[in-house]
Amino acid sequence: MLRSLLLRRSNARSLRPPFPPLRTLCTSGQTLTPAPPPPPPPPPPISSSASEKEFRKYAGYAALALFSGAATYFSFPFPENAKHKKAQIFRYAPLPEDLHTVSNWSGTHEVQTRNFNQPETLADLEALVKEAHEKKNRIRPVGSGLSPNGIGLSRSGMVNLALMDKVLEVDKEKKRVRVQAGIRVQQLVDAIQEYGLTLQNFASIREQQIGGIIQVGAHGTGARLPPIDEQVIGMKLVTPAKGTIELSKDNDPELFHLARCGLGGLGVVAEVTLQCVERQELLEHTYVSTLEEIKKNHKKLLSTNKHVKYLYIPYTDTVVVVTCNPVSKWSGAPKDKPKYTTEEALKHVRDLYRESIVKYRVQDSSKKTPDSREPDINELSFTELRDKLIALDPLNDVHVGKVNQAEAEFWKKSEGYRVGWSDEILGFDCGGQQWVSETCFPAGTLAKPSMKDLEYIEQLKELIQKEAIPAPSPIEQRWTGRSKSPMSPAFSTAEEDIFSWVGIIMYLPTADPRQRKDITDEFFHYRHLTQAKLWDQYSAYEHWAKIEIPKDKEELEALQERLRKRFPVDAYNKARRELDPNRILSNNMVEKLFPVSKTA
């Protein structure tokens, strides 16, 4: 699925048809006559003069009403052809043409702004930043909009480098490449493959801009491999207060390491120099195991595989293990053929969908899902089928458990090998729109894993069962080496340290606003439970692209204090004051996570 920044001009929108009137109003000059009371006992006979008096009174009322109506009509005359015109539905005035709507790919965060900038050259960017600094106009750096928490979004204004996407220099001998920060990962990989080069590691998807992927501390998997910011050996930063500065480990190393994972708050990353590796084919092996079996082999799995990840399926004992290693030049790929075809692997999932579709139609024939115009399920991929199954009853833990069991069967029949280039193999189909939370915590060293990574998973699965959380699959667990960037969740001064990254998820498989809100509420309940039970115990901190800002003031203060225990917040804010004193590169999220004292 192509996930890219959703940027669109707002179009004219129609107002809903006017509501039917609740009551008929009188025209100007008319009076509302109250309902007559119940008839009283017959009065004694009255004189004829009294009757005439009453008649004249009511005749006067009638004349007044007629006169008022006529006056109203002639005071506000309609055109002669008015009665022949069709009624027109009232419409709102169209929104301004320069109003841009920008959202992240999950549709969970969205802003509208008139100030959306896309410079084409470094000179354009420098002029933009200089002007914004002088006028104190906010221009928050935003990449491809893939961050689940919308960390790059700002109503006040944004700058996007999608038009600055060139490869500037390739050093084949040193395996280095210098690029503009707006280039997408896949675009870069395609451009340098002719030099026999590629990136050391990849995240799950390829549509991120290079500037964005390093600024939020993104990562791939492999206990010997660091997060992606460690591939950066030089960068050009356009700052509001000091102009364009070049940073490397030899040129202001302290600021260089701080800015590599700088959350877009220290300057706009304009150019990046990356240390690459030789392009190589990988052999991917996917198989099914259990947590008990993994405990016996965990140390070996981490140390002998270049890339490894576990995908846990809640409400089952199934763990999908995926390892990736360079293809041996001598033996090549295994010749074993898969035991099952794709059709056979999907059969159990399709059968559950057919069964569920009938069940939910019987239970509620008025329900909008499933749609009467269902697509041919034989044309749907596994992740598409999973989305449609979950959409039937996303908050029912029993139903979601059945979907997970069907997924376990799918993976058991999908075991096997696959060979491809690293940028093809290391990707992962994350499914449709979703809420996700991912934490990072220390897991010992490669030589001596602490096993706390597996303990974390055990407690998480027990929590899901105990609280009856409708937790879909997968719980994804990956590993990286340490990062030397102080703002990285995987920062460490010890070279041998390894870190585990665990992601939980809830899909948003529907466009219905009420259902999406219900799923959102349930996800944040799920996330809150993991936070309360696990984060402090394991020193776990959220991925910067997945952290969410609490609405409660006390919870926000607790989060700010917690971040101070792990990250050099004072040093980060000091650099912000020096490089961006007017905080034009900030947004609401950065301001709340790292409040800057006005007296500092």
Curated annotation (Swiss-Prot):
GO cellular component: mitochondrial membrane
Record's keyword terms, sorted: Membrane, Mitochondrion, Oxidoreductase, Transit peptide, Transmembrane, Transmembrane helix
One GO MF term attached to the UniProt entry: galactonolactone dehydrogenase activity
Transit peptide limits: 1-25
One Pfam family, short name: FAD_binding_4
Start and end residues of each FAD-binding PCMH-type domain: 108-279
Superkingdom in the source lineage: Eukaryota
Pathway of action: Cofactor biosynthesis; L-ascorbate biosynthesis
Annotated compartments: Mitochondrion membrane
Entry's pH dependence statement: Optimum pH is 8.0-8.5.
Cofactor(s) of this protein: FAD
Protein role: Involved in the biosynthesis of ascorbic acid. Uses L-galactono-1,4-lactone as substrate, but not L-gulono-1,4-lactone, D-galactono-1,4-lactone, D-gulono-1,4-lactone, D-erythronic-1,4-lactone, D-xylonic-1,4-lactone, L-mannono-1,4-lactone, D-galactonic acid, D-glucuronic acid or D-gluconic acid. FAD, NAD, NADP and O(2) cannot act as electron acceptor.
Protein name according to UniProt: L-galactono-1,4-lactone dehydrogenase, mitochondrial
